[in-house]
Amino acid sequence: MPGTGRHAAGIRGADARRITREVLAPHRVSERLLGDVLTVVGELVSNAIRHAGGVTAFDVRHLHDEVAVEVSDASPLLPHAAGTPVTVPGGFGWLLVNTMAARTEISVGADGKTITAYLSVTATMA
């Protein structure tokens, strides 16, 4: 599939961000969109590592009017916004992902879950 960054288990944040840059480079996305996508990639990958034992699959795709970031892990547990006080570091990743993404989808199966975040290309062109 053109424009895909499909990778297998064990990917770390730095590699996921590098792959994301490589996949999006031919599409000449705005710096703002690239920054948002890289933030979402970092949050989803680090959450999978921190809370679910690691990434089992990673993909990033440039679609016509959006960028899709897909991260799978082995946990069936759904992400949730932590009730962390603002004085305590961390706990804001899922909220951040949902703020930056136009929409998110979660599918749960026998092997864990896949979270897909869709970021609008047109919303960041202004």
Residue spans of the language-model regions?
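Conserved beta-strand-loop-beta-strand hairpin that lines the nucleotide-binding pocket
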Residues: M1-T4, I49-A126
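STAS-typified acidic loop motif
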Residues: G3-D15
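Short, contiguous strand/loop micro-motifs
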Residues: H7, E31-R32, H80-A81
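Short, motif-level signal for alpha-helix interfacial/capping segments enriched in acidic residues
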Residues: A8, A25-P26, H51
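Conserved short strand/loop->alpha-helix "switch" segment adjacent to the catalytic nucleotide/phosphoryl-transfer site
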Residues: A14, R18-G42
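Active-site rim helix/loop that mediates acceptor-substrate recognition in acyltransferases
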Residues: V41-V45, I49
